[in-house]
Design a protein with these regions (language model features):
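S-adenosyl-L-methionine
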Residues: 1-14
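Conserved acidic-Pro-Pro-aromatic motif
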Residues: 12-181
Length: 181
């Protein structure tokens, strides 16, 4: 049975609590609405992180161009699958810690990944969408790997095991990060 909960738009949250320095958006399919609301804010978060979809390269690039038009000029592509394979990171207090499967990784200011231009990130997404088509979650490769036949599913399963042994994850979901200039 549906459960109704009260909601607020981004502008109302900022009016009540002030503008955050870092905004993490993860609303399963509604991230685009929050990105659109950023344009209505008089003061914007210095850094924004959101989950990008796997359905449309055009849609992902449109999100990045929208943020660039709002003054965000530095970007990152954070491939979540690599976080689980990364060596332990240093926490804010200097201690070592690892990311659990499914996490979004470190806060942007603690990330070792360099910030890049919009054109660089656009190229990365073009390559990523090519990889999605070849070996991504909805690809023929993943479908074949699930096939019970030794002949149809065997080769993709062997390739997956080979990649896992070398800690080379197949493309999974991705977060984008943007920083105001």
């Amino acid at each position: 049975e549906p459960v109704r909960v009260p909601t607020l738009c981004l502008g109302e949250l900022v009016a009540r609590h002030g503008c955050p320095g870092f905004l993490k958006i993860d609303i399963e399919g509604a991230d685009e609405a929050v990105l659109a609301d950023l344009g209505r804010l008089a003061v914007r978060p210095a850094t924004v992180s959101w989950e990008t979809g796997k359905e449309s390269l055009r849609g992902v690039l449109r999100q990045h161009r929208r943020l660039a038009a709002l003054g965000y000029g530095r970007f990152r592509v954070v491939q979540q699958a690599y976080l689980e394979c990364a060596p332990p990171a240093l926490g804010p207090n200097g201690s070592h810690w690892s990311f659990e499967p499914g996490c979004s990784g470190p806060l942007p200011e603690l990330s070792p990944q360099p910030w890049k231009s919009l054109s660089w990130v656009s190229g990365q997404y073009a390559l990523l969408f090519l990889a999605y088509g070849l070996v991504g979650p909805r690809s023929w490769f993943r479908a074949a790997a699930r096939h019970p036949s030794r002949w149809i599913g065997g080769v993709p399963r062997r390739i997956q095991r080979w990649a896992e042994r070398r800690r080379l994850p197949l493309p999974g979901w991705v977060d984008s990060q943007a920083q105001l200039l």
